[in-house]
A protein has these predicted regions:
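Class I SAM-dependent methyltransferase SAM/SAH-binding core
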Residues: 59-116
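A short, conserved alpha-helix within the catalytic core of class I
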Residues: 136-142
């Protein structure tokens, strides 16, 4: 019988290492889109609305392995950014640190649950939360 997908399951089985997420990310290499998934996300932020000499505060909820930041480092490094990068497990946060070394942003790394983010409310110019909400058991809380 299949194990129920709970937070405990996700933490212990799916995201205790980064390999399963990294395998899913590799699927995108077969896309025929002009831009990668991560470039597409960045293009939809419309960073041109922000002045390059002003700090942009970004919260990345469920940052995963930090591949968004790694793939977009050249563009992101043109801006002054204070980034709070969060994920559900320590394994992901450790990989985020490794993958975001090229990004010049002032980075803070935290373990955080998508359903318990009250402390971040109202502090950011941009809040990212891609490919995360389907993990939340209580979607309204998330």
């Amino acid at each position: 019988m299949a194990e129920e997908i709970t937070k405990s399951y996700l933490k212990k089985k799916q995201y205790s290492t980064t390999r399963y997420l990294e395998a899913r990310i590799k699927i995108h290499q077969f896309t025929k889109n002009k831009h990668s998934f991560h470039e597409w996300i960045l293009n939809n932020f419309n960073l041109s609305l922000f002045e390059k000499d002003k700090t942009i505060k970004i919260l990345d909820i469920g940052c995963g392995t930090g591949v968004f930041w790694k793939k977009n480092s050249k563009t992101l490094n043109q801006y002054q950014i204070d980034a709070t990068l969060t994920d559900f497990t320590e394994a992901m946060v450790e990989k985020e640190k490794e993958n975001t070394k090229e990004v010049s942003a002032n980075k803070t790394f935290e373990i955080a649950d998508v359903e318990n983010l009250e402390k971040y409310r109202g502090q950011f110019d941009i809040v990212m939360c891609h490919n995360v909400l389907y993990h939340a058991q209580d979607k309204k809380k998330a």
